[in-house]
């Protein structure tokens, strides 16, 4: 059979769609399997090879599951709101709707051309009204239950994109979208109280099967810490400065306090501060810095000592000075810290620069740097002599609580989610601002709050949303009191639509609810979710938060959305570097399909290395996969033959290997095993037709077009994609014979082949006949024989 991919790949793709091979519906007589991949952001560049790898893993797994009799849901959609599309639309003077539709059409064509087995009847688009209606509905539920609030805050602002960014979207002081420097700006911000779910999000990680690194990243992102809150009285006024610390045991080593420059107590007691002009000047300097710049560990320490305000250490009773410094953030902890320079590197550097005392309270340091290890407590009154950190912390908390000056507590690194953007291409936030009633929710029966069509959607110079210019949208009536009111003009961030998309796939055409209870009960949770490591914090934590909230209010049936989460490694350029246009090392999957066919692309990407690790692209290996599929096709032209014990054993070993490797995402070794198998077939020069059919079913998840063609060429009228997955006979996977090492006095003299179940006498007879020990035993008497069944026969003689 000639491997002519151009002739049959599009044919089988059309047949699959015509006959709805991958379309599924609720069938309670079957076990369900919900496989999920991260739906793409449809960029103008189209799909890249990274998409093929990201989807290819679960593509193989879901095809196998379907053949194993599972009712498989494997959907796809498009996460199409967001800044990249809007920025491109502005640049090209094209409406975002047009850009989005064109890009989705391009992506759809490319995905179908690769032969992905998605259920195309369930496609969702986050920009469609029948989708974002329910995004708005969930937002209003969050608002209704007190998990949405508005506050004026210093926020991360991208001057290029002209919008507010969350901490997650501005890591490293750079905009996640355009990579411009982020600045700080005071704006009204909508927040989701994700911190209220911090403990539940941590606890939920114990009930799921995620890669260890994914669990670790989420735990670190949430950042739960155990410690204590303590109140330092201010000497000059009737006020207490509240701090949080994970090391209350070091409180006797506090020699100064540091407040964030924005701390409200500074303005409250401005008249008491003798150098307020210095404070104001320092604040102005801080306002020019991003949060990233302020919190860099290796930056030069700056600050101002407050003249006229002094703190009292609650345990020692000593007076300590108060500074303001930019490395303390108002949004972290309480906005103030106690400084223990002897045991904190940052505090040590600050103390050295400003000439503050350094008092060690843990034995072990040399005084030349901060000692951050464990040791015996010193200079700490009732804590002296304690060597166990946990005991010292507990003792300190106990005294603080007894004195009414503090209490044990927990803090989280994760902050509430900044949820609004001053841009056009996003879900309108369904809130009305009324002078009498405040912030009022748009009634549920008025959803969706539609995004108005705009020809000019460039953000305002001051960061004002383009929607603010649409009077017909802005001006409205308060749903509560009927007075004139104004609509919220900011839109939701791109993360909104992706925080629940896995639920809409279950019931994408339902106009009455986001998903029916029947569909939820049957399909949820997602059995296996695969995606990039770059999304295991932001997207996954956001979506877990939304899902857990919906569970708590009785709208979904499982506390966690994803039972299992895995991740693929990057595909690097041929030079071993990350692919980028600037490096000129980008590989276009369309060119590979044009030149070699979709099956070669699919097989190569699954074969190129450990699926979870990064692998460089290799054109020569692509050609090697083409030769492999040529040889597979060539087996159809081979003479037939009767099955033998050897051929059956080889096939059953292959079934076992491929089955296990797919389940464990060891796709490369599964393909390597198939390559080895056909080498044996070519060595034999013939293949049994029934055994060839079994091989074709094993190939089907990897190279489905060729598999379908061969299946029909072998006389079958059904789809191999729906053919039962082959089962192996364990007894036929065990070798009948084994090769064992023959040793004399512990030194290898050769090997012999013996029956796998051979006892010592049988093995010895074979060794004697082989002559492998004749020379070694000449003139000697055997003293002892040592036989390790199936491995070694050692002879001792003298």
What is the predicted function of each stretch?
Residues 1-36, 66-75, 99-106, 282-323, ...:
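Conserved oxyanion/phosphate-binding beta-strand-loop segments in alpha/beta enzyme cores
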Residues 3, 8-13, 49, 135-358, ...:
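NTP-handling and nucleic-acid-processing catalytic cores
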Residues 63-71, 91-97, 113-117, 144-150, ...:
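Secondary-structure transition/capping motifs at alpha-helix termini
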Residues 441-478, 483-487, 493, 741-745:
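Long, His/Glu/Asp-enriched segments that create or flank divalent metal/ion-associated functional microenvironments
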């Amino acid at each position: 059979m000639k491997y002519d991919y151009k002739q049959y790949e599009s044919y089988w793709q059309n047949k699959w769609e015509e006959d709805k091979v991958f379309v599924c519906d609720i069938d309670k007589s079957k076990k369900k399997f919900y496989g999920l991949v991260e739906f793409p952001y449809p960029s103008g560049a189209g799909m890249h090879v990274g998409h093929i790898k990201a989807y290819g893993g679960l593509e193989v797994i879901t095809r196998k599951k379907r053949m194993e009799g599972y009712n498989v849901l494997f959907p796809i959609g498009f996460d199409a709101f967001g800044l990249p599309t809007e920025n491109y639309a502005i640049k090209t003077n094209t409406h975002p709707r047009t850009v989005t539709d064109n890009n989705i059409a391009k992506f759809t064509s490319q995905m179908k051309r690769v032969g992905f087995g998605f259920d195309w009847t369930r496609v969702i688009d986050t920009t469609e009204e029948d989708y974002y209606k329910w995004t708005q509905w969930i937002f209003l539920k969050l608002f209704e239950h007190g998990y949405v609030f508005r506050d004026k805050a210093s926020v991360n602002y991208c001057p290029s994109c002209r919008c507010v960014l969350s901490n997650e979207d501005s890591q490293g002081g750079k905009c996640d979208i355009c990579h411009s420097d982020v600045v700080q700006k005071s704006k009204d911000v909508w927040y989701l109280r994700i911190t209220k779910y911090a403990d539940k999000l941590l606890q939920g990680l114990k009930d799921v099967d995620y890669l260890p690194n994914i669990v670790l990243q989420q735990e670190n992102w949430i950042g739960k810490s155990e410690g204590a809150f303590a109140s330092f009285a201010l000497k000059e006024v009737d006020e207490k400065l509240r701090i949080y610390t994970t090391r209350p045991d070091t409180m006797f080593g506090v020699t100064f306090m540091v407040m964030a420059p924005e701390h409200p107590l500074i303005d409250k007691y401005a008249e008491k501060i003798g150098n307020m002009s210095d404070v104001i000047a320092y604040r102005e300097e801080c306002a020019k810095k991003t949060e990233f710049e302020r919190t860099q560990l290796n930056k030069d320490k700056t600050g101002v000592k407050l003249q006229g305000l002094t703190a009292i250490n609650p345990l020692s009773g000593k007076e300590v000075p108060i500074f303001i410094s930019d490395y303390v953030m108002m949004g972290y902890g309480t906005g103030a810290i106690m400084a223990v320079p002897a045991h904190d590197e940052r505090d040590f550097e600050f103390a050295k620069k400003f000439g503050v005392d350094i008092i060690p309270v843990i034995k072990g340091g040399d005084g030349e740097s901060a000692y951050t290890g464990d040791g015996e407590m010193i200079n700490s009154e009732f804590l002296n002599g304690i060597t166990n950190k946990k005991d010292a912390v507990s003792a300190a908390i106990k005294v603080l609580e007894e004195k009414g000056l503090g209490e044990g507590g927990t803090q989280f690194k994760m902050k509430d989610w900044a949820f609004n953007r001053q841009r056009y291409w996003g879900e309108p936030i369904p809130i009305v601002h009324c002078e009498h009633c405040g912030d009022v929710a748009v009634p549920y029966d008025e959803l969706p709050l539609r995004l108005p069509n705009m020809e000019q959607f460039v953000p305002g110079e001051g960061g004002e949303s383009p929607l603010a210019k649409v009077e017909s949208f802005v001006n409205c009536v308060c749903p509560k009191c009927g007075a004139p009111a104004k609509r919220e003009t900011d839109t939701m961030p791109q993360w909104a639509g992706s925080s629940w998309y896995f639920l809409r796939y279950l019931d994408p055409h339902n106009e009455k609810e986001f998903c029916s209870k029947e569909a939820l009960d049957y399909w949820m949770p997602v059995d296996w979710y695969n995606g990039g490591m770059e999304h295991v914090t932001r997207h996954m934590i956001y979506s877990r938060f939304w899902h857990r909230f919906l569970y708590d209010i009785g709208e979904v049936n499982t506390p966690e959305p994803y039972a299992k989460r895995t991740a693929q490694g990057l595909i690097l350029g041929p030079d071993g570097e990350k692919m980028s246009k600037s490096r000129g090392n980008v590989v276009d999957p369309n060119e590979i399909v044009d030149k070699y066919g979709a099956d070669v692309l699919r097989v190569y990407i699954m074969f190129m290395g450990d699926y979870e690790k990064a692998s460089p692209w290799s054109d020569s290996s692509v050609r090697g996969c083409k030769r492999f599929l040529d040889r597979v096709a060539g087996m159809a032209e081979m003479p037939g033959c009767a099955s033998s014990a050897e051929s059956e054993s080889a096939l059953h070993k292959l079934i076992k290997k491929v089955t296990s490797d797919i389940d464990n995402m060891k796709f490369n070794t599964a393909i390597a095993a198939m390559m080895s198998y056909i080498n044996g077939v070519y060595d034999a020069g013939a293949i049994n037709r029934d055994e060839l059919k079994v091989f074709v079913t094993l190939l089907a998840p990897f190279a489905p077009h060729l598999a379908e063609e061969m299946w029909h060429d072998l006389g079958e009228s059904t789809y191999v994609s729906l053919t039962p997955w082959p089962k192996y006979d364990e007894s036929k996977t065990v070798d009948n014979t084994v090769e064992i090492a023959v040793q004399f006095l512990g030194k290898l003299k050769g090997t012999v082949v013996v029956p796998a179940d051979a006892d010592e006498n049988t093995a010895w007879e074979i060794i004697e006949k082989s002559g492998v020990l004749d020379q070694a035993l000449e003139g000697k008497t055997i003293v002892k024989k040592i036989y390790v069944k199936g491995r070694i026969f050692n002879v001792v003689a003298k």
